[in-house]
């Protein structure tokens, strides 16, 4: 009994290798700074406004039906001039696929990606940032989902295209906190997986209704069903199960 109990504890402490299932990725994941989250608090598509978080960090959200959203706030130091760091705030959303080998491909909606770039030493006006469209597909070689042994939170370890580790992400909301998954730009038309921007008269005629839908979505942002994850209820079950096993093991050793 004691041996079985120790094996169980060891199994719970090990990483849970991710199967290629979208349900595993469902939720909003954020980096350690805990200040960057996807959703309306990062990007306002009506005003086309990127909202700079307090600290750098990254966040990814995934739905179980194949949609994703990314919010990235990155600051890169300049080794030649420490007063000239390059900062970028990037928003994209679209669809994702998980291959049978566990790799993940993110395909953005071309018309919706936005980036705010600050490169003070390589701009005419160092006090002005550059706001532009941004389209960049992303490939992850694989990922792991496991419970962090220190914080007791679900953790997502993503391996980039070259196999290098991305900073770990922690589950913050489930269901995910996201903007609408359809194309948000009401004036430009493009296939949701196009890498080029095209004009289409039929889409322009629907711009008002689409903008209204987006505004209603933003007005209801505080009515979201996304739940902040401070701890996982399944971990409570594991905890009490472990306590029960420990009690049974102790009783067995005592009676023996």
From Swiss-Prot:
Which interval of the chain is the signal sequence?
A: 1-18
UniProt-annotated stretches for the region Disordered? 189-216
Q: Keyword set for this entry?
A: Endoplasmic reticulum, Glycoprotein, Membrane, Signal, Transmembrane, Transmembrane helix
Give the chief site where it resides: endoplasmic reticulum
Please verify whether the record's keywords include Transmembrane helix.
yes
Gene Ontology biological process: 'de novo' protein folding; budding cell apical bud growth
Q: Glycosylated where?
A: 81, 101, 127
Q: Which residues lie on this side of the membrane: Lumenal?
A: 19-234
Q: Name one GO cellular component term.
A: endoplasmic reticulum membrane
List locations, semicolon-separated: Endoplasmic reticulum membrane
Please name the InterPro entries in this protein's record.
Answer: Rot1 (IPR019623)
**Cytoplasmic compartment segments:** 256
So where does this one cross the membrane? 235-255
The annotated regions of Acidic residues compositional bias extend over 191-200
- Membrane topology category: Single-pass type I membrane protein
Provide a Gene Ontology MF annotation, just one. Answer: unfolded protein binding
Carries keyword Transmembrane helix? yes
**Assigned protein family:** Belongs to the ROT1 family.
What is the annotated role of this protein in its UniProt record?
A: Required for normal levels of the cell wall 1,6-beta-glucan. Involved in a protein folding machinery chaperoning proteins acting in various physiological processes including cell wall synthesis and lysis of autophagic bodies.
Q: What is this protein called?
A: Protein ROT1
Gene from which this protein is expressed: ROT1
